[in-house]
Amino acid sequence: MALFKINKGEIMNFVNSTQLKTDIPSFDSGDTIIVHNRIVEGKKTRIQKFEGVVLRRRGSGSSETVIVRKESNGVGVEQSFNIHSPLVEKIEVIKYGKVRRAYISYMRNRSGKSARIKELNKQ
């Protein structure tokens, strides 16, 4: 007979909590961030910066993801990052934006002045 009853959910929560990063700044959709991503090419590794607007921040715990969009040579580029991945070195917030949605998918259809986001002064 077992002395302690531990269910699988408690074990999973404990394992996931040990793998979470603690140095992640607070940001939401509409904010402009830089994600420092580690790229492994053969035996070499390098850090690549991806700067853009957060379209969506989704999930919780170790499965939390963020979609970042930027314009590169007139072409929109979106990249999805797992926030707590060991390949993400760090995340920097450049400026905070004011939007009314959690998922700003309408930004995909906009360019130029209509793609501007009002800046929020957060300290």
UniProtKB/Swiss-Prot annotation:
Gene Ontology cellular-component terms for this entry are: cytosolic large ribosomal subunit
Instruction: Give GO BP annotations, semicolon-separated.
Output: translation
Keywords of this entry: Ribonucleoprotein, Ribosomal protein
User: Which stretch is the leader sequence?
Assistant: none
Q: Which Gene3D superfamilies match?
A: 2.30.30.790
Segments passing through the bilayer: none
InterPro entries linked to this entry: Ribosomal_bL19, Ribosomal_bL19_CS, Ribosomal_bL19_sf, Translation_prot_SH3-like_sf
Task: Give the matching PROSITE patterns.
Answer: RIBOSOMAL_L19 (PS01015)
**A GO molecular-function descriptor:** structural constituent of ribosome
Alphabetical list of NCBIfam families matching this protein:
rplS_bact
Describe the task this protein carries out: This protein is located at the 30S-50S ribosomal subunit interface and may play a role in the structure and function of the aminoacyl-tRNA binding site.
**Protein family membership:** Belongs to the bacterial ribosomal protein bL19 family.
Write the protein's name.
Answer: Large ribosomal subunit protein bL19
What is the organism field in this record?
A: Ureaplasma urealyticum serovar 10 (strain ATCC 33699 / Western)
